[in-house]
Design a protein with these regions (language model features):
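C-terminal scaffold of the Radical SAM
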Residues: 34-36, 62-82, 86-345
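Flexible, acidic/Gly-rich N-terminal and inter-domain linker regions that tether
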Residues: 1-48, 52-53, 99
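Detector for the c-type heme attachment site
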Residues: 54-59
Length: 345
């Protein structure tokens, strides 16, 4: 079926993403049981002005976060009933920062996901946050939504490196965030939310201007001190990570220097009992991210919601509009919200 046929099929049967799934999806009636899926809720917010110039990212000071999350909720509710024969293995809020944008609406959204989808026992619910941008209302949303993994976009513990990144709040803001999140769990890492233990992951960057093996190890050790049960190592990309790339070019590490930095971080992680379960993802035993594992395996279908979100079932991909106005007003109308449908592979 060509992309036009898929889109017409979606509109003819109530206009839900579930109709795209129904084109080829094996169902319980065919004896396959519940089909495993992951759900991605796209939260494309960055606190830097203009989304730091990253295409598709939104500045929460310029865009009404509540209006966006409400549109996201409408899209979710419009599709949920079509996935009764599927089991959600993981829910991830992707694309940017989810915390401190519209916390009350976020908690309600995650509650709606739990109530309207069939979640597997122990299904992961993961979101991203920034140091200093987790309020008491954020923690309430985490509790309501049964968040089980908080990924801190920490980047570095070095003030010098932080300045090159142009972040809004310096790394010391993590001290406040750690207090807001509450005491460490009994095992010495992660947090406790309404009596449930949640993992605390830290994203660190490799190749920041001015970064050295010593400063990199200090960033890893800072993550340990804050209670990290997982650490993710990502590459610093000037277009996406640096506020003033031109002025930082002179002290940007060479490829060889960046590998030395990475090796120092990996050595520190291994010495602390962390193991690499996926390239760049290190975790203590038993604290690996189910979402990352499922996505890496490539065997689980993906249901995406939000601005520019991607849904993939049986080699048929649908992409939502990247136009904010269209999404805010027509998120529950696939004829207008879905921008493209095509086969992949």
């Amino acid at each position: 079926m060509d992309s036009r046929g898929v889109r017409e099929g979606m509109g003819a049967n109530g206009g839900c993403k579930g109709d795209l799934r129904a084109v080829e999806c094996k169902t319980m009636a065919e004896g396959t049981g519940l089909r495993p899926i992951v759900v991605e809720l796209r939260m494309p917010f960055l606190p830097e002005a203009g989304g730091n110039g990253v295409p598709g990212m939104l500045d929460p000071r310029m865009v009404d976060g509540h209006a966006y999350v409400e549109a996201l909720t409408r899209e979710v509710l419009a599709s949920a009933s079509d996935y009764a024969d599927c089991q959600v293995r993981a829910v991830a809020l992707t694309g940017g920062m989810a915390a401190h944008v519209a916390d009350d609406a976020l908690g309600a959204l995650l509650r709606d996901v739990r109530q309207n989808f069939n979640l597997a026992p122990g299904a992961e619910i993961a979101l991203r946050a920034r140091p200093g941008m987790v309020a008491a209302a954020s923690v309430d949303a985490f509790r309501i939504g049964h968040v089980s993994r908080i990924v801190m976009d920490y980047a570095t513990s070095s003030l010098k490196e932080w300045r090159a990144l142009g972040r809004v709040l310096d790394p010391g803001a993590m001290d406040v965030t750690r207090m807001v999140l509450g005491a460490l769990s009994e095992c010495g890492h992660g947090v406790r939310l309404a009596g449930r233990e949640a993992d605390l992951a830290f994203e660190l960057l490799v190749g920041i201007p001015g970064q050295t093996p010593t400063s990199a190890r200090e960033s890893v050790e800072a993550a340990f001190a804050y209670g990290a049960s997982e650490v993710r190592l990502g590459d610093c990309r000037p277009a996406a990570n640096l506020a003033v790339p031109a002025s930082a070019t002179a002290c940007t590490p060479s490829a060889e220097e960046a590998e030395q930095v990475r090796a120092a971080m990996q050595e520190a992680l291994a010495a602390a009992g962390f193991a690499e379960y996926f390239p760049g993802c290190w975790a203590l035993p038993g604290h690996e991210s189910p979402y990352e594992v499922l996505v890496a395996a490539g065997t689980t279908e993906t249901l995406g919601f939000g601005l520019g979100a991607r849904t993939l079932f049986d080699g048929v991909e649908a992409r939502n509009t990247s136009d904010l106005f269209t999404y805010l007003h027509f998120s529950d109308d696939p004829e207008k919200c879905v921008a493209a449908v095509h086969r992949v592979g």
